[in-house]
């Protein structure tokens, strides 16, 4: 546990579309569990440098889906490092080390929503029982169990399709993005914010994945 220096300063680490278990080995691109682990280590190092410079002691790790790669198509099955059951525990181990690394310097809160590629069943559904049948959900709750006695590590449970979090008066919406982010990203986001505004909820910031691009 780390004493909070400035309650108004909260850092956000966004994890999305990691696609654990995907295996890529071509001249222009390579990806496997080892590379994923190295990338997360580098992300942790850069995050610590940035957050320390801003006096941050509290971090939100926002996981917005597709932590696990799909295996529904033949090319995905042929380009998998392992099966998804074994891959789940490898993913948990890598994320556990990532969280522990950051927790050396910061208090951490972890929240998640489910993606589309990491779902267990082939069909996409929007019912909570269907959406939560996901490797994203499984990884989140395994991590929650792993850290249940840890100090300075907290978990937020909620709607695994879209989750709103209020941080120091700022309403943040977490979502994966499939089904609503398409065409013009800016227009799609404004439509989502408008949907919430019609119910009296003003969204200040939207965190999402799915499109595999930084904007």
Question: Which residues does each predicted region cover?
Answer:
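Extended recognition/assembly regions associated with phosphoester-bond processing machinery
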Residues: 1-215
